[in-house]
């Protein structure tokens, strides 16, 4: 009976050590984080009343690295399938589209005091003919900032037929 208890305790200790090792190696390390913060002076946009017949609407938010170190955008996701986002880089490239589900990796590094544009695109027809009324949507941006790792941009639209 004592041998069984010893094996049980040794097994539990080994399991705990393995779990600790895996948790430490799967999470981001302190070297991956920076003190810089990604900001947007405008975090909300009102499209006002839009017609389904007019199709998609878009708005550009300006994202700025407000720190002294390069910051990396790691992920962009939207709150609904009716919303997509594109990153418009300073060299004229477009990264995206980023949506609600599987999106391409971002991995865009923004230098200190540099800005990029995030284009929010809303499809008023995505919910079909019954999708009228006020729609609130969000775009979530993940970064490697230790101070503020997430930025949320929001918009609202009153959809009519």
Question: What residue ranges belong to the model's regions?
Answer:
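Feature for long, exposed domains in two main contexts
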Residues: 2-161
């Amino acid at each position: 009976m004592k041998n069984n208890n010893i094996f049980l305790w040794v097994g539990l200790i080994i399991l705990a050590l393995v779990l600790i090792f895996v948790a430490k190696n799967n999470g981001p390390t302190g070297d991956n984080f920076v003190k810089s913060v990604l900001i947007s002076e405008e975090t909300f946009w009102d499209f006002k009343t839009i017609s389904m017949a007019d199709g998609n609407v878009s708005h550009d938010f300006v994202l700025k690295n407000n720190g002294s170190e390069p910051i990396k955008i790691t992920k962009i996701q939207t709150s609904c399938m009716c919303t997509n986002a594109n990153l418009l880089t300073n060299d004229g490239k477009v990264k995206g589209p980023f949506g609600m589900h599987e999106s391409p990796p971002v991995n865009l590094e923004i230098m200190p005091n540099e800005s990029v544009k995030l284009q929010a695109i809303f499809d008023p027809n995505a919910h079909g003919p019954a999708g009228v009324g006020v729609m609130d949507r969000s775009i979530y941006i993940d970064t490697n900032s230790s101070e503020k790792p997430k930025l949320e941009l929001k918009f609202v639209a009153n959809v009519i037929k």
